[in-house]
Amino acid sequence: MNTETKSLPAWLDKVRWDDNGLVPVIAQEASTNDVLMFAWMNREALAKTVETRRAVYYSRSRKRLWFKGEESGHVQHLHEVRLDCDEDVVLLKVEQVSGIACHTGRHSCFFQKFEGNVDSGDWVAVEPVLKDPEHIYK
C-alpha cells in the first residue's frame, strides 16, 4: 500500500490520537527489551512504519515525517507493533541497526540515571557514547 496515493487503513482508527493527531511511541529493542527512545507518530508515520517495516516518526519541530536513520544510518527494523490498554501509546519492538538509537551516540536515549535521594540527588550518565555525534551527523 502506498500511503501517499491511497486513504489510510481503518485499523489506524483504533489508536486514540491526541488533539494534534499524534500518539506517543516507545521504541524497544526486540532482542534485549531495552527501551531505546521515545518519539511521536501521526497516522501516516504509523502506516509507513508498518508498510516499510522500518520506524518512521513524526517530528513536531520540523512538522514532517522523520525516517529513523535517514541521516545517521541507524535505522530501526520493525519486528512488532503493540498498542497499550488505553489505546493511546504505541510500542515498537525493533532491531536497532548499529546499536545506536540516540542522537548523542548512545545505545539508548535513556542513558541518564537518577542517583541519590530527594535532597541531594543528581542525574548521572550510565551508558557510554558508542560513536561521537560529530561523526554521525555530517
From Swiss-Prot:
The keyword Zinc applies. NCBIfam families: PRK00051.1. GO terms for biological process: L-histidine biosynthetic process. It is found in: Cytoplasm. One of its GO terms (molecular function) is phosphoribosyl-AMP cyclohydrolase activity. Zn(2+) binds at residues 85, 102, 109. Signal peptide: none annotated. Keywords: Amino-acid biosynthesis, Cytoplasm, Histidine biosynthesis, Hydrolase, Magnesium, Metal-binding, Zinc. Catalyzes the hydrolysis of the adenine ring of phosphoribosyl-AMP. Homodimer. It is an enzyme of class 3 (hydrolase). The keyword NADP does not apply. It holds the Pfam family PRA-CH. One of its GO terms (cellular component) is cytoplasm. Its EC number is 3.5.4.19. Binds 1 Mg(2+) ion per subunit. Binds 1 zinc ion per subunit. This is Phosphoribosyl-AMP cyclohydrolase. Coiled coil: none annotated. Its cofactor is Mg(2+); Zn(2+). It catalyses: 1-(5-phospho-beta-D-ribosyl)-5'-AMP + H2O = 1-(5-phospho-beta-D-ribosyl)-5-[(5-phospho-beta-D-ribosylamino)methylideneamino]imidazole-4-carboxamide. Belongs to the PRA-CH family. InterPro entries: PRA-CH, PRib_AMP_CycHydrolase_dom, PRib_AMP_CycHydrolase_sf. The gene is hisI.
